[in-house]
Structures are given as structure tokens and as C-alpha cells.
Amino acid sequence: MRRAAVSAVVIGMVLLGGNAAPAHAEPFVDIYTGKSYTRDADVRIRQKGLGNDFRVEDVAFDDDSFRDPPYYGGRVGYFFERYPWLGVAIDFVHFKMSADTSETKHFTGTLGGAPLDARLPMNTIVHRFDITHGVNYVTVNGLVRHSLLTDAERFPHGRIQLFAGAGLGPVVTHAENSIQNVQNHRSYEVAGLGVQGFAGVRTMLHKYVGVFAQYRFTRSDLDVRVPSGRGKVEEISHHVVGGLTFSLPDF
């Protein structure tokens, strides 16, 4: 799946970039909101001092995209003067993962040093496993675009622009969890390295202002703090994103 996603982004970059029309350099800023869909995943809890090392299989996650603070993000980038179809950008996005602990799940491993292999309501042991103050991606990205309906005066970069890109960077999390009635110490931490790929369309309403919509894919192996130990989960998410885009004069 990962190879297919990367291949799709690379092919998209080649196709979009290869047919782009000349234009001037362009700094830009995007602000956006959206909704994420995180795939079910196993959660592993390791609390060495307590004799706990167990896995909860196929945990479902709610996105809580519209709960305060909602899904939000911003991107600052630059398309090059010599290669106006090619750009770079720094992207920040905040979304959430909240485990549905009411469901019955398969537990395997050890609990209190004793073997554990049973189907139990997740909240029998893990009362809460949330990352609600953020799965926060900070990525450096390469991107390409293909300009349509260009006008030298009003829309020099194209009134409609197809774009695609990919990047990677640290994932900063703020986990909130409770295991066997003990809550974790809550704080921000770098929980892993994340990768993303995206593709979308940008429509300019004015020479310097427009709107855009895009699909985003993210993946990371998160390692977060739990009481007296660590919790691990593979985050694979699909996102639908929309917002405002601002094309800035190239000073």
C-alpha cells in the first residue's frame, strides 16, 4: 500500500510538472480545515515495572475533527521562477485520534506478569487512549502543479491549478490515556516520523486570493507516553481538506 501511494505521487509529479506553462516565481500561504479518517490499528501497551506488555487488536478511532480545537492547518511555500511548476513548502496539520474503548477487543500478551489472551471490553483495562490535543505533523514537502486558464495579467499562474506533493517530518503528539485507572502525565512530545502525500485543485478567485480542496494521506508509527510506560500505534489516515490560498507578490 505504501509503495503504491508513493508511486502514485511520483507519477503525478512527473505528469503535472512535465506539461506546465512558464510563469513567474510565486510565494504562497494556505490555511485550511478538514476531516480525517484513521484506519483501525493495534495498540501495544508496555509497562515494564508493572509486568504489563499486551496488545489490543483492531482498535477503532474517532476523528473528532470538529471538536474544539477542530482540524486545522497551514502551509507556506514557494514556486520557483526558473521552474514555476516546481515548489517547496512547510506544512503543519493538527488532527485527532480517539480510541473507542467501549468495544470488545482481543487482548494478547501479559498483564501483571500473567499471560493474557482474552476478548474483553477495551475499557476493562484501557479506559482511555486518545491523542486529542493533537497528532501534529510538521513536514517539509516537494510539490508540483499544472496551470490551466492562464492570463498574463489576472491569473499568471493559472486560474485553475492542479497540484500534488509529498513530504516528511516529525509528528508531535499530546496523548491522554488511562490504564487500570491510572492516568498518564500529559505533555507534548515528538512521537515519531511522519510521511504524507497529497493532491488537489486550486481555484483563484482573484490574482492573489483563491480556494483549494485536496486529498491527503498520512502515515506514522507513534510511540506515546502512558502511565509508567509507552504506548505504540500505527497511524494511517485519509484526509479531506479545504481552505483559502493566498498568492503573494515575489519581492
Predicted regions and their residues:
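Strand-connecting loop/turn motifs
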Residues: 22-26, 83-85, 157-161, 204-208
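Outer-membrane beta-barrel translocator domains and adjoining extracellular loop/strand segments
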Residues: 42-47, 100-106, 155, 174-183, ...
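Residues that define the transmembrane beta-barrel architecture of outer-membrane proteins
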Residues: 68-72, 134-138, 160, 189-195, ...
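C-terminal segment of classical bacterial N-terminal signal peptides
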Residues: 14-22
